[in-house]
Amino acid sequence: MTHQIAVLPGDGIGPEIVEQAERVLKALDLPLELRQAPVGGAAFDQFEHPLPPATLELAQGSHAVLFGAVGDWKYDTLPREFRPEQAILGLRKALGLFANLRPAILYPELASASSLKPEIVSGLDILIIRELTGDIYFGTPRGVRTAADGAFAGEREGYDTMRYAESEVRRIARIGFESARKRNKKLCSVDKANVLETSQFWRDLVIEVSRDYLDVELSHMYVDNAAMQLVRNPRQFDVIVTGNLFGDILSDEAAMLTGSIGMLPSASLNAAGQGLYEPSHGSAPDIAGQGIANPLATILSAAMLLRYSLNLAPQADRVEAAVRKVLADGLRTADIHEAGTTKVSTSQMGDAVLKALG
């Protein structure tokens, strides 16, 4: 069976880093069909829309999507619906992607690059699972209005709606428990149940789901404490499951513990296992075309693609082992370079990973 992969390089450094991930996938000699399409600003330049119908059709008809990055300052004056960033939102909605998986791993060779002391962060290996379709980002009603009553009657006010449906919480909780079961069997559910009705509802449902996973140790933590604990003692965590808003913030915080966001992959999955895989960093237009971008997050995203959407765990293991070997050999792109290591370009890093694959 041939697996079709939609390859959407995007803007900025996107094409450079995706090229290296494509090389790695092709080197594995698997039955893959990689098909490219424009997205983001690159698509707007050609079709006056960040997510053209042909690109969306390709993504919907593929087993998985390998995504680079979108965005550039030159598009900031466009109406919101035409900005490059709308492409990723459109893909999430069209593909029904509801679970975002963000690993935060500190490789031993990069311990000195972390913002925390090595004795605190050494051995860090966290998986943060963020719900993508609900919460305050998508709740309605929302907008700006004139307050009709209360202490601020007559003033303009902005308002949003935080909401979660029961089915949304149950399905993301199951992803959390299943992921923890495959790791160290520890799941921490993060909420704000002491203040928010939505969070108390979330917590109650996670507890209900936990009865199907008695082999997994479940704990709960308020989001403010979780943010503190990620800095104070990050190794206490194995898998974290949380809502859209809290996950957006905590996953970026965890990213900075690893030394460089250029090392962090991510996966967004739907109920059928179809996924969109992308590096956690942005399009970095300021360094685009210079050949200095770090492709490892994208290569590791390709490994996640193999693992989660194609069920090819052995091949994913090979790619991840190759990345570890390259780091152990002292090769570094500019973002993680330090004294005593060898600085390499984007393509040279890709060459090194291919060599390590054997």
UniProtKB/Swiss-Prot annotation:
Feature type site, description Important for catalysis? 137, 192
Q: Which reaction does it catalyse?
A: (2R,3S)-3-isopropylmalate + NAD(+) = 4-methyl-2-oxopentanoate + CO2 + NADH
Instruction: Give a GO biological-process term.
Output: L-leucine biosynthetic process
User: Where along the chain is Mg(2+) bound?
Assistant: 224, 248, 252
Q: Does the keyword Glycoprotein apply?
A: no
Record SUPFAM superfamilies: Isocitrate/Isopropylmalate dehydrogenase-like
Gene Ontology molecular-function annotations:
3-isopropylmalate dehydrogenase activity; magnesium ion binding; NAD binding
**One GO CC term of this entry?**
cytosol
| Alphabetized UniProt keyword annotations | Amino-acid biosynthesis, Branched-chain amino acid biosynthesis, Cytoplasm, Leucine biosynthesis, Magnesium, Manganese, Metal-binding, NAD, Oxidoreductase
Supply the InterPro entries for this chain.
Answer: IsoCit/isopropylmalate_DH_CS (IPR019818), IsoPropMal-DH-like_dom (IPR024084), Isopropylmalate_DH (IPR004429)
Query: What Enzyme Commission number(s) does the record list for this chain?
Result: 1.1.1.85
Which branch of life, at top level? Bacteria
| Cofactor annotation | Mg(2+); Mn(2+)
What PROSITE patterns does its record include?
A: IDH_IMDH
Compartment list = Cytoplasm
What are the cysteine partners in each disulfide bond? none
Identify the residues that bind substrate. Answer: 92, 102, 130, 224
Major place of localization? cytoplasm
Listed binding positions for NAD(+) are 282-294
According to the record's subunit comment, the protein's assembly and interactions are: Homodimer.
State the function annotated in the UniProt record: Catalyzes the oxidation of 3-carboxy-2-hydroxy-4-methylpentanoate (3-isopropylmalate) to 3-carboxy-4-methyl-2-oxopentanoate. The product decarboxylates to 4-methyl-2 oxopentanoate.
- Of which family is this protein a member? Belongs to the isocitrate and isopropylmalate dehydrogenases family. LeuB type 1 subfamily.
- Name of the protein in question: 3-isopropylmalate dehydrogenase
Organism of origin: Bordetella pertussis (strain Tohama I / ATCC BAA-589 / NCTC 13251)
Which gene is annotated as encoding this protein in its UniProt record? leuB
